[in-house]
Amino acid sequence: MPDEGQSTQISVIKGDITTMDVDVIVNAANSGLSGGGGVDGAIHAAAGPGLIEECQELFKRDGPCAAGNAVVTSGGRLKATWIVHTVGPIWDLHGPVEAPELLTRCYHSSLDIAARVNASSVAFSAISTGVYGFPKELAAPAAVSAVASWLQVKAGTHNMQDIALVCF
């Protein structure tokens, strides 16, 4: 475990999350974990057919993944060892009060899983900002705040060194 004084670098970068050389990438998934469009589809395509099989098994065992929750699979053919799939809020469904709370839960749930698999580096895709309609101007500061609050609460309990918020 890191000592209390260890700091974690948080960065915002533009790039292709499917090519990131990190321990964990975080996928903006749908509740069925079935792949789809946008970054979810790109991650599934790059990871290969084994990923959809893993996701189907998780779905059969546990059912749909609710908004704010996260699950983990292997990274398939990606450089990342693990993929954390989190289901973000749908802005028009959850609304301006519940959606930000669920978005924070997405980041916290994902980081909890990343810590559990002993990750030192994590790259997040933009959660809920595509077809789920979460306004980008609200999602970006919410993401930074959620990561920062998780790091503060979990200080000394993880090995996280680098957390990237990846924009495309």
Show the residue positions of the predicted features.
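Glycine-/small-residue-enriched capping loops at alpha/beta junctions
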Residues: 1-116
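Phosphate/ribose-phosphate-bearing ligand recognition and processing surfaces
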Residues: 90-168
